[in-house]
């Protein structure tokens, strides 16, 4: 079902959503930028909604509320895949713009990570502060073979602080260790306050003087979207961390 639904969503290679007459497949409508009519509903979508109506007509009324809740969840699930397609396309658009002088950096925080033990009590668990992990995936293009290279930089703090200073410190280390160093960068992140804030924007204004790197643009995406690769990296890091903890417990 997911594959068939996503196939009917259309977006240009430049990341521009395309109008569709079926409102369920119109990306422009999904993001509130469509002023055209949606005169029809496709057969698959109509069958889906008719299916829920059919069930409601053949079950007790006390189950109707649960069915409505399931339908809302299904619509939310469809919305998630709509956003994912749209935002992942924008990631690809920026990667396609790369040349040998630039870099695309995708950054993200892992939510608070709690130290774990195989034999800890509940009071021990809730008393912990945990630590924060910040990852930067740096994409550059090899001028010799025109292929993308990826470097990963992980930084963690022994508290749960996720703010502009931790972000700036992490990126400082990235620029100091990148080899070769790019002439310009595009940053992609969620729109959390640790990125989307005045303090960090003021710091970015000094990047040219400090690192000889031009910040071409900073793209803010929805939290949790379009970061599949960095999410996979976080999963591997946490899995390795948990295995080490268990081994030494």
Model regions and ranges:
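Extended mixed-charge, aromatic/glycine-enriched low-complexity segments
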Residues: 1-249
């Amino acid at each position: 079902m997911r594959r068939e639904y996503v196939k009917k969503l259309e977006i240009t290679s430049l990341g521009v959503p395309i109008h569709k007459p079926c409102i369920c497949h119109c990306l422009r409508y999904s993001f509130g930028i469509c002023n055209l009519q949606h005169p029809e509903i496709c057969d698959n979508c109509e069958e889906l909604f008719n299916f829920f109506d059919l069930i409601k007509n053949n079950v007790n009324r006390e189950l109707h509320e649960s069915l409505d809740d399931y339908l809302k969840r299904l619509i939310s699930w469809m919305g998630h895949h709509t956003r994912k397609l749209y935002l992942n396309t924008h990631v690809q658009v920026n990667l396609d713009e790369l040349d040998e002088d630039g870099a695309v950096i995708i950054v993200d925080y892992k939510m608070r990570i709690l130290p774990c033990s195989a034999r800890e009590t509940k009071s021990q668990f809730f008393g912990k502060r945990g630590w924060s992990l910040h990852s930067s995936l740096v994409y550059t293009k090899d001028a010799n073979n025109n292929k993308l290279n990826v470097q990963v930089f992980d930084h963690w703090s022994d508290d749960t602080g996720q703010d502009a200073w931790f972000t700036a410190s992490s990126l400082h280390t990235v620029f100091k260790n990148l080899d070769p160093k790019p002439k310009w960068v595009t940053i992609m992140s969620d729109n959390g306050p640790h990125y989307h804030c005045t303090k960090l924007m003021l710091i970015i204004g000094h990047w040219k003087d400090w690192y000889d790197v031009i910040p071409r643009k900073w793209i803010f995406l929805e939290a949790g979207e379009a970061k599949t690769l960095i999410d996979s990296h976080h999963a591997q890091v946490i899995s390795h961390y948990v295995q080490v903890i268990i081994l030494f417990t």
